[in-house]
Regions:
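Bacterial N-terminal signal peptides that target proteins for export
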Residues: 2-12
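Acidic, polar-rich low-complexity tracts and alpha-helical solenoid repeat scaffolds
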Residues: 2-3, 22-183
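Bacterial N-terminal signal peptides
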Residues: 10-20
Length: 183
C-alpha cells in the first residue's frame, strides 16, 4: 500500500509540474507550441466548431424556401436565421476568443546559431506560432456573419488579411470579406 501511494503522489506531482511548465505562452519552445496546439485544437476549437456546425444545421431547418420569390444565395441573408442560430454562434465566438486569448504564442523562439535553411528563416519570421489561431479568427468571422453582425465580420476578415498575409487562409478571408461587403 505505501508503495502505491508513493507512485500516485509522484504521478500527481509530475502531472502538475508538466502543466506548469507547458502552460506559459511567454516562452516559445517546442514543448509549449505542441501543448498549446494540442489543447487549442482538441479542446476549445473543436467545441466551437461543433457549435458552429449545430448553428448551420439550425439555419438550414429554419429557412423556408419560397420558390415563387427570388431565393437567397446564402443562409445568413435571412433575418429569421440570425435569431435562430444566435446562441450557437455566440458559443462559437466565445470558444474562438478563448483560443486566441489563452493559446496564442507570439513570442519569438531562440534563433539557432549557424546557417539557416529557407524553411527555418520562414519559421522564425512568423508572427503567430499556434496553428489554430488563424482558424479561430476565421470561425469567429463566419459566426458573426450568421449572427447578422456584418461589420464585425468584415473587421475580423480584415484582421486575418493583415495578420496572416503569407498563410493560405488569407484567400478564404478575402472570399468571406467580399461576402460581408455584399451584405
Amino acid at each position: 500500500m505505501p508503495f502505491r501511494k508513493t507512485i500516485y503522489k509522484g504521478l500527481i506531482v509530475l502531472s502538475f509540474l508538466s502543466c506548469v511548465i507547458s502552460c506559459s505562452v511567454e516562452k516559445n519552445t517546442s514543448l509549449t507550441r505542441n501543448y498549446h496546439n494540442l489543447t487549442a485544437h482538441y479542446n476549445v476549437y473543436f467545441n466551437g466548431y461543433e457549435s458552429y456546425k449545430r448553428g448551420i444545421d439550425k439555419a438550414q431547418t429554419t429557412v423556408m424556401m419560397d420558390y415563387h420569390q427570388i431565393l437567397p444565395v446564402f443562409l445568413y441573408e435571412d433575418e429569421a436565421v440570425h435569431s435562430a442560430v444566435n446562441s450557437d454562434m455566440k458559443r462559437a465566438i466565445d470558444k474562438a476568443t478563448k483560443v486566441i486569448t489563452y493559446h496564442s504564442i507570439t513570442a519569438k523562439p531562440k534563433v539557432k546559431e549557424g546557417n539557416q535553411s529557407p524553411k527555418d528563416k520562414a519559421f522564425y519570421e512568423q508572427n503567430e506560432f499556434n496553428k489554430w489561431v488563424d482558424d479561430s479568427y476565421m470561425l469567429m468571422g463566419r459566426a458573426y456573419m450568421y449572427q447578422g453582425e456584418f461589420f464585425l465580420a468584415a473587421e475580423t476578415f480584415k484582421h486575418i488579411l493583415v495578420t496572416f498575409p503569407k498563410e493560405d487562409i488569407r484567400f478564404l478571408g478575402m472570399i468571406w470579406l467580399a461576402r460581408a461587403y455584399i451584405m
